[in-house]
Every structure is written in structure tokens, then in C-alpha cells.
């Protein structure tokens, strides 16, 4: 099948793109508003775009009412955020933070997560996350209806148990989760791994 983009409706394009560009890592972004309200939200339009220094990218849509999501507003206001990685142990809590809450709601409390003080940014890390990247805003780029945010990592926090003495990642201990299309996710460990 072929789909001419200009002749294909938005719902179909959304379904195709999200179902075909897989698996996608999940950036679980924690921010703080200028008024001190904590926020967490997961994004699967996410990846790393540079390694030295590390630069991460998230792409965020608007709310259904076409207003900015809290993550975008907070990042543009404070110029900083933390990208936490999702592992199997926190998967259910991540799903809670993916629900749309009013700006005054603290998602840490809603999901039963612990804010952990960051070293270089005001936004807290998620203590339960095995990996966190403290980021300062590198660049903001609007792309059609999306808000693309690039963050330069200032610090990478990694749980000791997932790295060996040579700093290789043990995926059986990390147990990362990725996003597929629809309501499907994938475990990026165990028999799913292919070694070449």
C-alpha cells in the first residue's frame, strides 16, 4: 500500500506513523513551573540527537483545547527539565503520569513517585527512575503543530546496578520499556534482544 500524505487524513497518518516508527524510547520528563508546581509527563516522540555533549529531543503536541501542555510551558519558562527513562518497575506509574491533569496538579503525588533533588537544575529527578538526564534548554523549534525541545544534558544519573565495571549497560537489570503503536508497549530486554 502507498499513502500520499497530502491525500491522507490526519487520523490515518497518526495511526500509521506511530504504528510503523517503532519501537520508540520514552522520555519521562519532569519539570517545575515558575510557581513551583511539579509536573511529570511521558513522551515517545523522543530520542538522543548528539553524544558529546549529550543532547536529547522531545516533541510535544498541544492539549486537546490547543493550549500548551505543562511540560512545554514549564520548559519555556524555566529553560530546564529532567528526562527520566522508563523501566519495567515504574511502568504503571508512568501510565498515570500520561493522563491529562490540570496545571495545578502535582503528578509526583498522583503517581506515588518521589521527587529527588537535581544537582544542576531546579526540576527534580524521579527517584524511582534508574536513569535521569538533567538538561538545560538548548533549542526550541516549532514544527507545524508540535513543540520540539532540545535539551543539553548537564548530568546523567545512572543506578549503579545497571552498569558493569566497563560501564556497559546490563539490560536485564535496566529493563527499559519502549512504545509501539496504539496502546502497546515493548520490553527492550530478555529474549527481545538481538545480538550481532
Curated annotation (Swiss-Prot):
Keywords: Flavoprotein, FMN. The keyword Flavoprotein applies. One of its GO terms (molecular function) is FMN binding. InterPro entries: Flavin_Rdtase-like_dom (IPR002563), Split_barrel_FMN-bd (IPR012349). Pfam families: Flavin_Reduct (PF01613). It comes from the Bacteria. Its cofactor is FMN. PANTHER family: FLAVIN REDUCTASE LIKE DOMAIN-CONTAINING PROTEIN (PTHR33798:SF5), FLAVOPROTEIN OXYGENASE (PTHR33798). Belongs to the flavoredoxin family. This is Uncharacterized protein aq_928. It comes from Aquifex aeolicus (strain VF5). The lineage of its organism: Bacteria, Pseudomonadati, Aquificota, Aquificia, Aquificales.
Amino acid at each position: 500500500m502507498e499513502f500520499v500524505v497530502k491525500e491522507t487524513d490526519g487520523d490515518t497518518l497518526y495511526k500509521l506513523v506511530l504504528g510503523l516508527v517503532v519501537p520508540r524510547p520514552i522520555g519521562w520528563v519532569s519539570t517545575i513551573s515558575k510557581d513551583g508546581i511539579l509536573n511529570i509527563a511521558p513522551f515517545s516522540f523522543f530520542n538522543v540527537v548528539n553524544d558529546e555533549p549529550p543532547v536529547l529531543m522531545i516533541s510535544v503536541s498541544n492539549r486537546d483545547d490547543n493550549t500548551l501542555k505543562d511540560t512545554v510551558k514549564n520548559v519555556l519558562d524555566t529553560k530546564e527539565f529532567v528526562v527520566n527513562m522508563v523501566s519495567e518497575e515504574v511502568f504503571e506509574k508512568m501510565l498515570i503520569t500520561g493522563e491529562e491533569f490540570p496545571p495545578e496538579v502535582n503528578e509526583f503525588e498522583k503517581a506515588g513517585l518521589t521527587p529527588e533533588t537535581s544537582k544542576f537544575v531546579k526540576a527534580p529527578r524521579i527517584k524511582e527512575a534508574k536513569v535521569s538526564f538533567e538538561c538545560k534548554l538548548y533549542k526550541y523549534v516549532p514544527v507545524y503543530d508540535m513543540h520540539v525541545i532540545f535539551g543539553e544534558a548537564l548530568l546523567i544519573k545512572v543506578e549503579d546496578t545497571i552498569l558493569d565495571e566497563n560501564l556497559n549497560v546490563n539490560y536485564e537489570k535496566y529493563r527499559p520499556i519502549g512504545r509501539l503503536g496504539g496502546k502497546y508497549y515493548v520490553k527492550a530486554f530478555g529474549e527481545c534482544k538481538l545480538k550481532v
